[in-house]
Structure formats: structure tokens, C-alpha cells
Regions:
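Short, structured helix-loop element that forms part of the nucleotide-activated donor/catalytic region
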Residues: 249, 255-278
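Short His-centered aromatic/hydrophobic patch
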Residues: 108-113, 132
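Carbohydrate-associated surface elements
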Residues: 174, 196
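Active-site proximal beta-strand in glycosyltransferases
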Residues: 5-6, 121-141, 169
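A short helix/loop element that forms part of the nucleotide-sugar donor recognition site in Leloir-type
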Residues: 203-217
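N-terminal subdomain of nucleotide-sugar transferases
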Residues: 1-69
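Conserved donor-binding/catalytic core segment of Leloir-type glycosyltransferases
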Residues: 218-234, 240-244, 259-260
Length: 278
């Protein structure tokens, strides 16, 4: 299998540490997918906005997979929420870089990247494949208490991307159904590609006892762990409340119970960490 794919992930970089800021599961998904395609002979360039002045314009992260930086906007201080202000400039720079090279398909991730990719796909006649990952209309239908709704600019942007894309990748049947019912996507353009699991990483290894010894946990501890960016809709507060209820019903569990919350604040939402502590 041969070919070249231009993957676009504007709001976060494969070079960032997942679990901090806006870097999360999407970073891992995009990088791992690119490496699997590269193993089949497809060259993948991942385009992202520069957020580190000390990193080269092009960084090879594995054989056949490179990160290419879009030099648009300030290096520091631009949150994901402010990125829509830069869509026009990002589109121009991405189109320029694309016109100087040759790619068979563009694969954009998240609505901002889809909007950035649309002009290049149209001008250069390259198929645009898009993965939403999350959708504003779905999130707004399932808001946590006190959570701010997604803005209309995102709803409109997602609708435009769905209409412009040659193909749409959904992770689940439910996501595919939402694309059709909430965004009027053509069912023939929606393809469900379920994410896989890297069993070389997610394995029992030397066993539970050895793992507990490494991280300093008692062998008889009852361990509950949350792993992910700390955002209301990911449910860390639900874990804390459930743990509290469990202790009320079974107070004898308290001495052995250990609750781990592993992850950092997401984007500008740093107050959530302090709120959970309280």
C-alpha cells in the first residue's frame, strides 16, 4: 500500500503530553493511527499549529510519520476556545503548504481542523475525510450541571464540515447516528471505524502485586482510579460522590480505600481541580 495522507489536528500537537492542557486521547488516537498506516507503507504528515518556539518546523516522530508546524498566531496563550479567531489565517497557511507538496487525502480531526482544511481540499481537489471526536449538539444535549453550552460558532462550523467532507469517520454506531440525525450527514458518507487497543501497552505485565509495589500501594488496598483530563463531563465528581456514598454504607472500607485521580486541568478550566479538592 502506498500513498500520502495530510492529517490535520490544529488545536493540539502529537508532541504534547496527553492528559495536560488540551492534549488528550485524540493525540494518542491520531499518532497511533498514523503509525499503523505508516507500517503499511502510507506516509503520514500531521499538521498542527506551532505552540513551542524551540521545536523544528518538521519533526519525524516515527518512520513514515512526521509533524509539520503551521506558524500562525502567538506561540503561547492561545486556548482552544480562541482558535476560531485564527481559522482564516490557518487555512491560508495550510493551503499554501499543501500546494507546495503532494497528498492523496486530507484527514482532519475536530471541527476547527475541518474548517481549516475545507479551502485547501476545495482548491486543490483533494478528498477531505473528517473525524469529529466530539460534537457540539451532542454535548449540549447532555450538559453536566453548571456546564457551559458549546457556542453557536462551533455548531455552525461542524455543520459546514459535515456538508463539505467527502467522508466522515465515526468511532461508534451511536456517533454515526448522531452525525445523520443531528447534522444531516448522508449515511453513505459515514463510516464506523472502531478504535483498537494496543495490547503491548495495556497488559497485566508482571501482575497486580508487582504493580502495587512499584506505585507504593498496599496489597490489600481497594483502589478506584480516574484517568483523564479533569473536565466535568468526564465524571471525576461522580467518582468522588460515589466513593463517599460507598463509605457511608460500608464505613469499614475507609481504611483500605484509595482514590486516585490522574490527569491535569483541560485548557483554561483550571478551577475544576480546586473545586474537586474541596
Amino acid at each position: 500500500m502506498n500513498g500520502r495522507i495530510a492529517t490535520l489536528m490544529v488545536h493540539t500537537s502529537p508532541l504534547d503530553q496527553p492528559g495536560i492542557g488540551d492534549a488528550g486521547g485524540m493525540n494518542i488516537y491520531v499518532t497511533e493511527s498514523a503509525e499503523r498506516m505508516a507500517a503499511m507503507g502510507v506516509q503520514v504528515d500531521i499538521f498542527t499549529r506551532r505552540t513551542n518556539k524551540d521545536v523544528a518546523d518538521i519533526v519525524e516522530i516515527s518512520p513514515g510519520v512526521r509533524v509539520r508546524h503551521l506558524n500562525v498566531g502567538p506561540v503561547d496563550g492561545v486556548t482552544k476556545e480562541r482558535l476560531p479567531e485564527l481559522i482564516g489565517e490557518l487555512s491560508k497557511e495550510f493551503t499554501r503548504m499543501m500546494s507546495e507538496d503532494s497528498y492523496d487525502v486530507i484527514h482532519s480531526h475536530y471541527w476547527i481542523s475541518g474548517k481549516v482544511a475545507m479551502p485547501a481540499a476545495e482548491k486543490l481537489g483533494i478528498p477531505l475525510v473528517h473525524t469529529m471526536h466530539t460534537m457540539a449538539r451532542v454535548k449540549n444535549l447532555n450538559l453536566a450541571e453548571g456546564e457551559v453550552p458549546e457556542p453557536m460558532i462551533r455548531v455552525q462550523g461542524e455543520t459546514q464540515v459535515v456538508a463539505a467532507a467527502t467522508g466522515l469517520i465515526a468511532n461508534t454506531d451511536a456517533e454515526a447516528a448522531s452525525l445523520v440525525s443531528l447534522y444531516s450527514a448522508c449515511p453513505d458518507n459515514v463510516h464506523v471505524v472502531s478504535p483498537g487497543v494496543d495490547l503491548y501497552t495495556f497488559t497485566a505485565g508482571a501482575g497486580r502485586a508487582a504493580a502495587r509495589e512499584v506505585v507504593g500501594l498496599a496489597q490489600d488496598a481497594l483502589v478506584i482510579t480516574f484517568v483523564g483530563r479533569i473536565q466535568p463531563h468526564k465524571g471525576p465528581e461522580l467518582l468522588i460522590r460515589a466513593t463517599s456514598e460507598m463509605i457511608k454504607h460500608s464505613p469499614q472500607l475507609r481504611p483500605k480505600l484509595v482514590v486516585n485521580i490522574i490527569g491535569g486541568a483541560s485548557g483554561a478550566n483550571t478551577s475544576e481541580v480546586e473545586r474537586l479538592k474541596e
